[in-house]
Amino acid sequence: MSAATLKVSTESRPSSRLAVTVTVPGERCTASYEEAIKSLSRSINLPGFRKGKVPRSVLVQQLGGVRIKATALEKLIDSAWRDAIKQESLEPISQPDLSSGFDGLLESFNPGDELTFTLEADVAPTPKLKSTKGLKAEYEAVVYDASRVDSMIEDSRKQLATVVPVEGRAAEKGDIAVLGFKGTYSDDGSEIEGGSADSMDVDLDNGRMIPGFIEGVIGMKVGESKSVDCQFPDDYPKEDARGRKAAFAIELKDLKTRELPELDDAFAKQASEQDTMADLRKDLEQRLKDDAERRQTSNRNDGLVKALVEQLEVDLPEALIQQESRNLVEQTAAQFAQQGMDVKSLFTPDLIRNLMQNSRPEAEERLRRSFALTALAEAEDIKLDDSAIDTKLKEVKKDLSADAKVDPERLRQAVMDDLMQEQLMSWLETNSTLTEKAPEPESDTKS
């Protein structure tokens, strides 16, 4: 039967769902039932009968009318759905669900009688912006910090330092202490999970331990043991430890320190590709300035898009949220794989479900940002110029190695996406009020 014989009506539902009600004529129902009998006859094996030669009455008796009807109905729903979306030029983005459920429909299905059922599926939403111009946006300023040059140089000195044993003095800030320790909670005396070690190198300068621990070690001598009182921060990652007082029995087993290289041209060559300290400082300054500029631009763009999203009206379909959540989980898995982790054993079904659920807010936010920008491009008729695309493509190809294998279509699409993003951000900056806000103070959380 052709799709023209179907009666189809549609109704919009919340969350960008579309209800499609299909009425299938009786003759098509009969044809589906007869085809189900033929199909089952070809596949079933019954003693005394060749495959495909089982009499109809025997087949119905052996399989039962319900199984035959169920097979016919499944195929009927599938074919009717495909014909209906083609007939009505519909573009669903998910598989359909029966509104009434399959079992209920099966009870009312009688070959030869007209059959009506409703299927629901997600469709692409239609995003709208309440306003595009005169938006008020805020961004956090990023200031180039010249002192970071010295910090980066000192970090390089530490990495290139020679570790030597300490003799004849107590532990000082900046030393490397080899410790044995055992931690217990002060309130109930229970042992702290992960709070013990037989021999562990602890840097007495980087503040990675909880407050009070390193301070208690400073001043100790090799071979000395003592009890140090500490308290876990209120924002400590492990919830059951937050704010609790603890006692650590600590033994200083060995003590080492770093002999730092001189800050000379030889160090510059060893630590970088620069020949002199002056060149090294100049290079680091430029890198930090470029980084500050990139972060400043990113903050400005984030502020503008946030203001735009506040103007967005869109009903996100579940199919898109699930797909975006999967993308985020796959990105996480790829990062773990790059670190050499066994992703297949690590990512159990339970973990994947938890990650999918936890990534949902970020997935929804990503979709809203994307739809807001798409709606802006449509509302303000922002389009790309072919010559700009070609020029950018040539620039990108120049930076690619000669043996790089790149899909031309994917490369062109990536270039178009970048250019459109630049145009949209430029338009927003021109047509919005962007206000700088003071940077938030950096938290100094110790873990």
Curated annotation (Swiss-Prot):
Any one Pfam family here would be Trigger_N
- Which Enzyme Commission numbers does its entry carry? 5.2.1.8
* GO molecular function terms attached to this record: peptidyl-prolyl cis-trans isomerase activity; protein folding chaperone; ribosome binding
GO cellular component annotations, sorted alphabetically? cytoplasm
Specify the PPIase FKBP-type domain's residue ranges. Answer: 174-261
InterPro entries reported for this sequence:
PPIase_dom_sf, PPIase_FKBP_dom, Trig_fac, Trigger_fac_C, Trigger_fac_C_sf, Trigger_fac_ribosome-bd_bac, Trigger_fac_ribosome-bd_sf, Trigger_fact/SurA_dom_sf
NCBIfam families noted in UniProt: tig
Entry keyword set:
Cell cycle, Cell division, Chaperone, Cytoplasm, Isomerase, Rotamase
Name assigned to this protein: Trigger factor
Reaction(s) catalysed by this chain, per the record, are: [protein]-peptidylproline (omega=180) = [protein]-peptidylproline (omega=0)
**Domain topic, free-text comment:** Consists of 3 domains; the N-terminus binds the ribosome, the middle domain has PPIase activity, while the C-terminus has intrinsic chaperone activity on its own.
HAMAP family xrefs: Trigger_factor_Tig
Question: Where does the UniProt annotation locate this protein?
Answer: Cytoplasm
What task does this protein carry out?
Answer: Involved in protein export. Acts as a chaperone by maintaining the newly synthesized protein in an open conformation. Functions as a peptidyl-prolyl cis-trans isomerase.
Q: Name one GO biological process term.
A: chaperone-mediated protein folding
The entry sums up its family as follows:
Belongs to the FKBP-type PPIase family. Tig subfamily.
Q: What class of enzyme is it?
A: isomerase
